[in-house]
Every structure is written in C-alpha cells, then in structure tokens.
A protein has these predicted regions:
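Domain-terminus/edge residues, biased toward the C-terminal soluble/receptor-binding domains
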Residues: 172, 183-188, 192-404
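Bacterial N-terminal signal peptides that target proteins for export
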Residues: 5-27
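Sec-dependent N-terminal signal peptides
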Residues: 27-33
C-alpha cells in the first residue's frame, strides 16, 4: 500500500505531548479510533491504470480538493476557454458586494451572431441574482454583459477588474477580453489556472456551487418567466457530479467540472476539444482514472473523539476534542509512505469551549493528501463517574468498543 499509518495524527504524537503517564488509556483509545476511521474506501480500487485516455483535449488536468495535481497534459498551454470565463465573472460580481436582489435597468448589448442569449434588452429590469443564474446555468452571454454593467458601470471596467483578480489569484496564463467568453484575440486561460479558479469559486461562494449543480433555472425575462436548461450534460449524467461550467468557441469546446465521491472532491478541466460531447467524455475519463487509480482514506472523523482536555472554567470538567470536519484523502498505492506534520496545543493545557486545538497535514511524495483542523467542543463532556479523567476516558472506551 505504501501508507505508513494514515492514522498518523494520534494525540500521542502531537507537539507538547509530554503528558502524565496516567493518560496512557486515552492514547490507546485514540489509536483505536484512528485505526478504524482510516480504513480504505472499498469504492476506490488499488490498481495502477497508467494514464487516462483522452480523445480530443489539447490540454487536461485533474486535481483533488487540496489542489494537488493527479494528472496533467499541457497544464500551462494558453487556449481559448470560451464560457468558462463566466466563472470569473461570477466571482468578481460576488466579491464586489453589489446587492444581489436589487433591481437593475438592462441594456441592449452587442453580441456575436448566434451567441447564446436569454433575451434581455433595454427597457427590462432584473436582479443581479437572476442574471447570475441565467449566466451560470444557461451560459447566457447577454446576462454576463448585464452583470458587468450592473457591477462596474461598463463591460470595459469590469473586464479590467477580472484581469486584476486573475493576477491576484496567481492565474498567470489567463487573460480576459470580455465578461462572457465569446471569441476574442488574447482571450485565453490554461487548465491549471481554471481548476484553481473553479476550486476557489466552488468553495468560497455557495451561490455559485448551488447554481452550477442545477439542471435548469427559471428566471423572469421581461414579463415572462423563462425556463433555461443547463448546458452541462456532465452534471446530469456523471455520478457525484457537482458542476461547474461549459465552454464552446467557434472552433474548440471546453469544460471545467467537479465531482465528489466517498468524501473526496475532484476538479478536472479540458481545453481544446473539438466536439461538445468530447469535452464531457474526456472529463469523465480523467475522473474515472483518478477514482480507480487512488485509494481513498478517511483521515479524520468529525464524530470521533480524538482526546479530552481539562475545561478551563470549571474544576473537574473536561471538554472533547474532535476534527472540525470529516476529511478524506487520495493516496497513490504505488507511491511513497504517507507522512504527516502536526501542530497542536500542549497536552494538559486548560481549554475553553469551541477553541482551536491543532492542525494536521498528510503528504505523500511531497504532495498534500489532506489537511484537518481540530477544535474543542461547544459543550462539556458529561461526567459519568465522579470527576476522574480516567473514569471519563474508560467510559468512552467502553462505549466505542460496544458500538464497533
């Protein structure tokens, strides 16, 4: 397997772990907890399938939720990303602080012939929220232009902010000429930049994450409620798909996608495809390869007790320490050992409620596998047998053994 104890962050290994010897039963219990929660997921096969098969993509990439590259082809090639542009449009709009539910006067905007449009024109009004939904689901180019004007007063000013934001995010192979992604000289990005953008958008803005998962959206266009279908076939057909955005130019197609299975989220991007179907086929190939080539491990469980600490404000009471979230990671079975680093409060330190206690990061062959943070709970642990810490620990040990 090449995994040296994915259960690595046992409290006995935490910094400042020079605890009294009578803490021993807790250490044994915690080791048991981690040994069980770190069992490999049966859904992820332990085979090396080589490289994924790509039929059309000139550039491709697949990463995990940490941003770790699992596979790439021409990751920094600068290629037309078409309507994937609209993810940055949404990011800039949401970061502007503009009122999503305010009503904005719309305009007649100039678009290329046959460009996808919802039908907005001067004399109509819309909320920014509805414009964003039409733009992200149906890829309405007129909606993207209206978003830009509503937020910045003009498309030009908005595009300037898009490029500034790209620089701030370190997207060094990305340049925008418009807010919608219609073909324009100098308008390009790379798969490495786009998965970074996509991961940021999906994890930072619930509106984006929830909208790109929709199969259709109904919005007012003038006085008519119009139902607009999603351009994303991937989100309708691929198990675990989350979104996020399609792209189609005059000569190439593209796709930025995300999916989640067994607690692990993947991001994939393909650029330079030649058909609408091919972009989805290649994305599926990337993700299928990742699921099958890596082993999934649960490295932290929010419901599992990690350790208990003495409560700072009440003698004899203790507070539980747990992971802040369930954390999974992908481990390459033929790679090197999985190791970890842990930074944590010294054992025995008086602890309040809902306070950070430590952070653990697992790595394999230099890549980050997963990161977990740990905090004290928001309630005191009930005392079942007097005030003794050992009695408290033994109670949890028995309860855990019975549950197992």
């Amino acid at each position: 397997m090449g995994v040296s104890t994915p259960t690595a962050c046992r409290p006995s290994q935490m910094s400042g772990a020079g605890a009294p010897s009578r803490i021993g039963p807790l250490l044994a219990f915690v080791a048991l907890v981690f040994a069980l929660v770190a069992a490999p997921s049966p859904a992820l096969a332990k085979t090396d399938l080589g490289e994924p098969t790509l039929t059309e993509a000139q550039a491709a990439i697949v990463t995990d939720q940490e941003g770790t590259v699992l596979f790439s082809k021409n990751p920094d090639a600068e290629i037309n990303m078409a309507s994937i542009t609209k993810i940055m449009t949404a990011v800039v709009a949401l970061e502007s602080g503009a009122d999503l539910d305010a009503t904005y006067e719309l305009h007649d905007v100039t678009l290329a012939e046959n460009a996808m449009a919802a039908g907005y024109h001067a004399g109509m009004t819309s909320t920014l929220r509805d414009l964003l939904r039409a733009m992200l689901v149906y890829s309405a180019n007129d909606a993207a232009s209206e978003v830009a004007i509503a937020v910045s007063g003009s498309e030009e000013a908005f595009v300037q902010r898009m490029n500034e934001r790209a620089q701030e995010m370190g997207l060094s192979h990305t340049h925008f000429e418009n807010p919608h992604g219609l073909d324009a000289e100098g308008h390009h990005s790379s798969v490495s930049d786009l998965v970074t953008l996509g991961r940021y958008a999906m994890t930072t803005f619930p509106l984006i994450a929830s909208t790109v998962s929709l199969h259709s959206v109904t919005v007012p266009v003038g006085n008519v409620q119009v139902t607009l279908p999603s351009t994303d076939e991937f989100v309708r057909t691929y198990p675990g798909a989350l979104g996020i955005k399609t792209g189609a130019g005059d000569y190439v197609t593209s796709f930025l996608g995300s999916a989640r299975r067994d607690g692990v989220t993947l991001y994939a991007c393909v650029l330079g495809c030649t058909t609408r179907e091919g972009r989805f086929t290649d994305t599926e190939s990337l993700m299928d390869w990742a699921w099958k080539s890596y082993d999934g491990y649960q490295l932290a469980s929010k419901s599992g007790l990690v350790r208990v600490e003495t409560y700072a404000l009440r003698f004899g009471q203790v507070v539980a320490v747990n992971a802040d979230a369930d954390v999974w990671g992908l481990v390459w079975p033929n790679g090197g050992p999985t190791t970890y680093t842990m930074t944590a409060n010294s054992r025995g330190m008086l602890t309040g409620l809902s306070e950070p206690v430590g952070v653990c990061q697992w790595t394999q062959d230099g890549r980050i596998v997963a990161t977990s943070s740990y905090s004290s709970g928001d309630k005191l642990v009930p005392t079942y047998t007097g005030f003794g810490l050992i009695d408290q620990i033994e109670h949890y040990t028995r309860a855990f053994a019975q549950a197992a």
